[in-house]
């Protein structure tokens, strides 16, 4: 019988007699039909002529596939519910796509405080320049008489309410609303004394006393004006203003442009040179104050545009396009759903890169002041997506090894230093300023965590201590994608997160329940697939009686966890199972206590299928059975790739295993050999084009990845030895080598060249290195908790 006819026979249509349900039959038959037709015309050369053993292996593999399909419980359990979930995910994805496509200059909530300053502007006839702003104030008083965000922070409510009362009183409008506002101020002013100063809005200590003075000039009686908390705020203003050299304020743009309405003695002729797009650092209140004093046409046009867009109200800062684009990408990535929006993410990052400068960026394009928070976030995301960015952007934020949020400032925000720390971890070798940034930000964050002071002055979020803690405890090189997503699903507050500017504000395209809902559904879907796969891989372990070779299911679970936490997408099933089974078989074989001669015979039997001398009885039988398990697994993985990808990888996969066995036999670098085996198994299983294997960049990535994986394996072994009383000096030295090698790998993965591999292939090298780093870095307790959390813990 010809090989083609044998294939045609073995790949016969699956029927109900095989115990497979209709949908499963269709899955098998659709693939088998292709290969039957190819076999008939000689279009498939799956095995060498005359090698009937390969035919039998194909048949066994086919039976395994059918059995695996029968074990997929989700095929028989609640198919209707799956359809409902899939439809819901589709609707949510389309909704998010619409949001991302409609990004312009930033979706942001309205600030009553800034709207009040705009409402104070009078036209050339002495009437309100912006009557719709007064109308907005009138229509948006809260039930308790205050104005402000639904999140109650007394600084925010008092500032907004007093500003709105001043605006309405100035135009002699709605006295009853003014009285209700003053009643709220009277009843709540003393609460300022006990509020956390980290929640104080930007510039509050400067603008609030000035607002009180403006109210008093209108005859508004301010309750508790002599209270200790008011005197303290006034003292803070006096101290801050004394530290501000007025000549510097008029000499170059600084962050003080954001709060001009709280300052006196301003020389407007000089300050007008510091406008950007008609505004003073994108602040409507600061720009409105300038317009009152200068009648500048560009300031007027900026405010007209903002008032029109927001229907009378204005936000505390606008535009916020750079901020919105970057933080949106960051949230989508950390939630684990960025793969659904690759096109939109590229468009967003292209937009940011278009306005990127050699000094960094701020929250809006074309600003003349930059901040370290937006710059760090932009640098990190751009670098990770292959854009060419220079570390020189951080120079203006550094002085003597210390880093600040704005040039010349000495205060810090937790999130600012948090983003600096995250960015510093993707440094390339020789980028000293990022090394300094990493040391400084890590020390700062560790100290804040120890002091239980992880409260930010820029955002009120669900679990900032959790976000910072994860970053400190699980460095970027160890942060497996699904592990990060699982933690962030609990830390992300969605719509409830609120930002702190001059007032509290919200960014619906950054903090969105829609993102969170899709992310949870996606995670649950993937987790269900992973749990079913774990059952199937347990069955493989038990059917093969692999426990008899000394390694328990716990080691198998770790191997599967590493694969599922990295190649987590449902469609990557083949890669996951190939990774997990390969890693476990490597560990199982390496754990056998065999002589050099026995290792050679093991490798020979796998390569040639020869029968070993049975004179030593059980030892040889056991080893022969392990060879058989290895051979069958290679055949199974090859067949599954044949069906899924249309590629015959049997010979290549066998050759890859032979290389590893040769290294094992000769006592070579097993960490390096295992990394190469895992990488090539992944690439073969994914159907990677054969030309990629000979690409110069492929060989370069392979060399560096294998080197660092070997270093990590040695480090892991030495760390284990150290725990038993070994020498630790060598471990410290190895760590420096590892970091340098990881930086070398990161540079290869994250930089683009004219003749380059595709990004997905390059990322796979980093993924394997990351898995080695994870097991070397994290202790057993952390790993066990991560496994449970990622694979088995339910999501609320």
UniProtKB/Swiss-Prot annotation:
Motif (DXDD motif): 371-374
Pathway annotation: Secondary metabolite biosynthesis; terpenoid biosynthesis
Cofactor: Mg(2+)
Targeting signal (transit peptide) range: 1-23
The entry's keywords: Chloroplast, Isomerase, Magnesium, Metal-binding, Plastid, Transit peptide
Tissue spec: Highly expressed in leaves, and, at low levels, in stems, but barely in roots and flowers.
Compartmental location: Plastid, Chloroplast
EC number per UniProt: 5.5.1.13
Annotated binding of Mg(2+), by residue: 371, 373
Domain-level remarks: The Asp-Xaa-Asp-Asp (DXDD) motif is important for the catalytic activity, presumably through binding to Mg(2+).
Reported function: Involved in the biosynthesis of ent-kaurene diterpenoids natural products such as oridonin, miltiradiene, eriocalyxin B and nezukol, known to exhibit antitumor, anti-inflammatory and antibacterial activities. Catalyzes the conversion of (2E,6E,10E)-geranylgeranyl diphosphate (GGPP) to ent-copalyl diphosphate (ent-CPP).
Protein name: Ent-copalyl diphosphate synthase 4
The species this protein was found in: Isodon rubescens (Rabdosia rubescens)
